[in-house]
Structure formats: structure tokens, C-alpha cells
Amino acid sequence: LPGLFLAVGAAPAAAIAAAALMGPAQVAARVLEFTLLRRAHPLLSAKLASIAHPLGAVLLLALGAPVAALFVLLHGAGNGVQTIVRGTLPLAVFGPAGYGARQGMIVAPSRFFGALAPALFGVVVEAAGAQALWLTIALNLAALIALFFLRVAPASPEAPR
């Protein structure tokens, strides 16, 4: 993240300070999700998580270094909630039968590409600067659109919540 902030004109110290907000933003978002959205369907949390990064990225591209911290707060919040949604949304969509095996099939590719993403994105940032954010904006918006097409069966009375 600091390299991205340098690309939009942030001073080195400001870039590092903004990037340091990532962890606190993730934790704060998880606490808010647990307290404010605990009775909501995980699909709502997934949609909110998917829009957070694109919103922050557009603001960063439009306004530059002064909103680097806001970008990190939104990006971190979305990332933090996504870690919860990765477990709760498949359970809500598919139910508890075969949950472990299904999660393994879902999580394996995610972990693989998640491990590659920082290095690959670093290469893209080196080549395109802050404009590399358009790639992440597009990917997150594609995920958001997919979530709007996701059909969830109503929960049965005996289904765990």
C-alpha cells in the first residue's frame, strides 16, 4: 500500500501511516459486523464488503494523497468483513450438509490466488502506478454484481443461525 500512496503523491511518512491503519480497520469492521449486522443475512455483509474497496479506490484516484487514510479504512473494512463472509455466506447459501468439503473447494483457489495477489499487484502498480486500482475496482464490482444475482433459499426453521 505505501507504494500505491506514493504514486498518488503522498509523502513517505504519510504513506506508511495510512497503510498502518489496515489492521485496525479490519478489526473494527469485524466488530461492527458482529454487533450491527449479526441478525442480517450474510449476503448483506458480502455486498457491503464488496463495495467498500471500489468506493475507497475511486476516492483515492479522484482526490489523491489526502484521502489515503480513508482508502485504507474502506479497503481494510471490506477485507475484514470478507473474512467473516467467506465462512458465513456458503453456510447460508448451501446449508450445513457437506459444509466442510464445500468450504475446502471454495477456499483452496481463494488461498492460492490470495497468496499470489500481493506480488502480482505490486508488478501492476510498478507498471501502471495508481491506475492499477482500476483492475481491483473492476474485480470487486464484478463480485458485487455476482452477489446481486445470487439466489438464496429461505432458511428452514431448524437451520442454525
For the regions a protein language model found, what residue spans apply to each?
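Short amphipathic helix-loop junctions that connect adjacent transmembrane helices
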Residues: 1-13
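Loop-to-transmembrane helix entry
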Residues: 10-24, 101-105
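Helix-to-loop junctions at the C-terminal end of transmembrane segments
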Residues: 29-42, 125-126
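Structural signature of the two symmetry-related core transmembrane helices
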Residues: 44-59
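Helix-loop junctions at membrane interfaces in 12-TM secondary transporters
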Residues: 62-71
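Intracellular juxtamembrane helix-capping segments at the cytosolic ends
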Residues: 81-94
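A late C-terminal transmembrane helix in Major Facilitator Superfamily
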Residues: 96-128
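Symmetry-related core transmembrane helices of the 12-TM Major Facilitator Superfamily/SLC fold
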Residues: 132-149
